Design a protein with these regions (language model features):
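Charge-rich, low-complexity N-terminal segments
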Residues: 1-80
Length: 80
């Protein structure tokens, strides 16, 4: 089982509240098969037996924030 923690920080938003962007990023991974995730205050825990699925979920989350008009996104990913 592969576990990863991803923390996404939208930069240069019109508001200091990033919850809208984070919620949309999490929504983007809800239908990825063979992926389990858990939300906590510091990020989102991703779990899968396949590293490609972890990568797909991470990419989806980051691209979702970009598609919402945020050009700069700071991302921290820890993988175990």
């Amino acid at each position: 089982m592969i576990q990863a923690e991803i923390s996404i920080y939208p930069m240069a938003t019109k508001t200091t509240n990033a919850s809208f962007y984070i919620a949309k990023a999490i929504e983007s991974i809800k239908n990825i098969e063979n992926l389990r995730y858990e939300i906590n205050s510091m990020g989102t825990i991703l779990e899968s037996d396949d590293m490609d699925i972890i990568n797909k979920a991470s990419k989806s989350m980051i691209e979702t924030v970009h598609h919402l008009g945020i050009n700069r996104v700071e991302v921290i990913i820890k993988i175990d």
